[in-house]
């Protein structure tokens, strides 16, 4: 059974906690489907080409219908002309969204957590909180403290997951390129797969692994 690594306040390993048994044997195809669903939902539908009705010009017939020895043409906006309209081109009216049901979303999340645990990249800490130093009635050095936490983990990049995250903690991590901190309600399988390691508050971890099969 896969286990998450429990860290102490100094981010040193002090134990482990098992993932529920239902996390075992989940098909990886659920994660594949969720990643396709996620990427399609954030895709910017901006590709657009002009058809022959939208390009400028073409108000008159370019040459006489007969007698010139050339193929007949009615307008320079025809797709056969350089600068004419595009046939079957990109349109910004296409809907790229792919549907996925709630059960597949849950299974994808559970599979991604299981993969992180098997790779020893899933960590649990009691609390993720950055307080900084109070100077001139303002909290300062927030990012410095957050960076020290990240460096102590010795990971390439890290996803931090909190429950009821405070503003100081959110600001502290916002300037770090290789870190992302989110509330547990924003957690999804794509983010778990995108980061090489995951650090979760104990309360957030319990919130995620509780049995939701009845929902």
UniProtKB/Swiss-Prot annotation:
Belongs to the universal ribosomal protein uL4 family. InterPro entries: Ribosomal_uL4, Ribosomal_uL4-like, Ribosomal_uL4_dom_sf. It comes from the Bacteria. Coiled coil: none annotated. Gene3D superfamilies: 3.40.1370.10. One of its GO terms (biological process) is translation. Keywords: Ribonucleoprotein, Ribosomal protein, RNA-binding, rRNA-binding. Pfam families: Ribosomal_L4. One of the primary rRNA binding proteins, this protein initially binds near the 5'-end of the 23S rRNA. It is important during the early stages of 50S assembly. It makes multiple contacts with different domains of the 23S rRNA in the assembled 50S subunit and ribosome. Forms part of the polypeptide exit tunnel. Residues 46-76 are annotated as: Disordered. This is Large ribosomal subunit protein uL4. The gene is rplD. GO terms for molecular function: rRNA binding; structural constituent of ribosome. GO terms for cellular component: ribonucleoprotein complex; ribosome. The keyword Ribosomal protein applies. Part of the 50S ribosomal subunit.
């Amino acid at each position: 059974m896969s286990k998450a690594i429990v860290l102490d306040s100094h981010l040193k390993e002090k134990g482990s906690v098992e993932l529920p048994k239902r996390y075992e044997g989940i098909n990886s195809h659920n994660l594949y489907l969720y990643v396709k669903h996620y990427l399609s939902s954030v895709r910017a539908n901006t590709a657009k080409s002009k058809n022959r009705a939208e390009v400028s010009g073409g108000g008159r017939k370019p040459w006489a219908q007969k007698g010139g020895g050339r193929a007949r043409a009615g307008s320079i906006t025809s797709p056969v002309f350089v600068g004419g309209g595009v046939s079957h081109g990109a349109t910004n009216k296409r809907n790229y969204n792919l549907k996925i049901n709630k059960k597949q979303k849950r299974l994808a999340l559970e599979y991604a957590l299981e993969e992180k645990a098997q790779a020893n990249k899933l960590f649990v800490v009691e609390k993720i909180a950055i307080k900084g130093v109070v100077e001139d009635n303002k909290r300062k050095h927030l990012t410095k403290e957050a960076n020290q936490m990240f460096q102590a983990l010795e990971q390439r990049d890290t996803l931090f997951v909190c429950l009821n995250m405070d503003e100081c903690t959110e600001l502290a991590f916002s300037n770090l390129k290789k870190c992302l901190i989110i509330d547990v309600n924003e957690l999804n399988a794509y983010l778990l797969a995108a980061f090489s390691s995951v650090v979760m508050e104990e309360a957030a971890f319990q919130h995620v692994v509780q049995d939701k099969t009845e929902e």
